[in-house]
Amino acid sequence: MNEIFSATVIIGVLSSGIRLATPYLYAAIGETFGQRSGVLNLGVEGQMLLGAFASFYVALTTGSLVYGLLIAMLVGALMGLAMAYVTVNLHAEQGISGIGFYLFGLGMSELLFKMLLGTVETVKGFSVVPIPFLSQIPVLGEIFFQQNILVYIAFLLVPVAWFVLNKTTLGLKIRSVGENPEA
């Protein structure tokens, strides 16, 4: 029982937690822009599932993690555009449409997995990039500063997104449209 609470296990769990939460951070940043523009997208999880499957499949078949990442971004963007079109242009209820997009992403990703793969495969992920000096800090260095590049980019995007939304003309326009769609 004591080995469960050892420093190595706790550090490993916390480090993995940060790495595994990164896709949700990306989704939250993207959804923040959507929310501020007045679109409630409850289908974000479906976007993530379809993007994750597309990314995995492309990375598996091409051997390129970069191609997989690019296709995930493309699939997520297309799903977001489709959601925006349905709610803004077709005047569909955002909550119901979002749930529909979530269920579509859930079902389609599972269907494509079974049709195209059928069995569990693995793809080696992006390599860990330790940040010099900071990664040597006991405990905190191992948790925060020995991650892959996508984790670092996600955390850098948080203040960038805040700046864009709150300190730029583009952010003002996004917030204005979200507050008053008739403007």
Please report, for each region that a protein language model flagged, where it lies by residue.
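Short, strongly hydrophobic alpha-helical membrane anchors
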Residues: 1-12, 136
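Single transmembrane alpha-helix segments in multi-pass membrane proteins
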Residues: 12-61, 69, 73-74, 78-95
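Transmembrane helix-loop junctions in multipass membrane proteins, especially transporters and channels
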Residues: 32-39, 64, 92, 115-122, ...
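Membrane-interface starts of transmembrane alpha-helices
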Residues: 63-71, 94-97, 101, 149-153
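A generic, well-ordered mixed alpha/beta core segment in the N-terminal half of proteins
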Residues: 74-132
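Transmembrane helix-bundle core of multi-pass membrane transporters
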Residues: 106-167
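Membrane-helix/interface signature in polytopic inner-membrane proteins
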Residues: 160-183
